[in-house]
Every structure is written in C-alpha cells, then in structure tokens.
Curated annotation (Swiss-Prot):
Coiled coil: none
Source organism per UniProt: Bacillus pumilus (strain SAFR-032)
Assigned protein family: Belongs to the UPF0735 family.
Residues of the ACT domain: 70-145
InterPro entries named in the record: ACT-like_dom_sf, ACT_dom, UPF0735_ACT_dom-cont
Pfam families: ACT
Record protein name field: UPF0735 ACT domain-containing protein BPUM_2431
Highest rank taxon of the organism: Bacteria
C-alpha cells in the first residue's frame, strides 16, 4: 500500500466542499446533528461530497494528537513571562519535553518549547490563540511536529 502524504493547507484556500465536510464532521462530533443526512443539510453539502472527502480532510489539531510539537516564541523580557506561558501549556494538558530560552537582548527573548500533545484537552488552535493573547508575546508559531 502506498504511504499517504499529508499537507498543511490554510482553510481559506480549501474548496467549499472540503470546508463544508469539516463543518459536517464538527456537527457530528459535537452532537449538533442527529445523522449524516441532518449534518450535510445544515452545512448545505451533498452527501456524496461528504463521503468523498470525509476520510481525506482533517483539522490540523487532530493530526497532531499524540505528537510532539515544537513552538517558537518571541517575547518581551518581563518578570514571570515564561511562567505564565508554561502555565497555559500545562493547563491545556500538554507535557513540556524541553525548553530553550535565549538571554534577553534589547528587552526581547526567544523561547523554543517542545511539548507532547498526548494529554492535550484542548485543540492546538485554542492553545495557540491563548498564547497569542498574552501581552508579552510578540510572536508564536509552530516550528514543526513529529512522532
């Protein structure tokens, strides 16, 4: 059997049928629809399109469950900043595997975190949004992920 190749694609460039397939899957997962027929009707998608894409399109966070993710942060140098950042990661259920922090220069520091998402209660997008909202975080991005 041929090994599957996956790509990370921004939602806004996906065809409507794929976006709506993700919406149908979300409706079913959250029990907001009683059946596939009900969910596709709510999402305005044909059942055939749903069945065509249902096993081919996934939210990013479902692909990184039980994975290791490396995050990069550019932070203002403030007392307690790293502690607050780590608290959000811990509250999400992630396990911190490694931390690397540069010495602050000109009031800024870089932090690289490798985390295990096996116990993550939230999806990665929720965690990333919480981290971005911290007033001392200038930049946060996913550098990579792997098993």
């Amino acid at each position: 059997m041929k090994e599957e190749t996956f790509y990370l694609v921004r939602e806004d460039v996906l065809p409507d049928a794929m976006r709506k397939t993700l919406e149908v899957k979300k409706l079913l997962d959250r029990k907001k629809a009683d059946s596939v027929a009900d969910a596709v009707q709510q999402a305005d998608l044909s059942r055939s399109a749903f069945y065509k894409y249902r096993d081919a399109v996934f939210p990013f966070y479902t692909m990184v469950k039980e994975q290791i993710i490396t995050l990069f942060f550019h932070l203002e140098d403030r007392s307690g900043a790293l502690s607050r950042l780590l608290q959000i990661v811990a509250d999400s259920g992630c396990n911190v595997l490694s931390i690397h922090q540069t010495i602050p220069l000109q009031g800024r520091a870089n932090v690289t975190l490798s985390i295990s998402t096996a116990g993550m209660a939230d999806d990665i997008n929720t965690v990333m949004n919480q981290l971005r909202k911290l007033e001392f975080v200038e930049k946060v991005e996913i550098l990579g992920s792997g098993a």
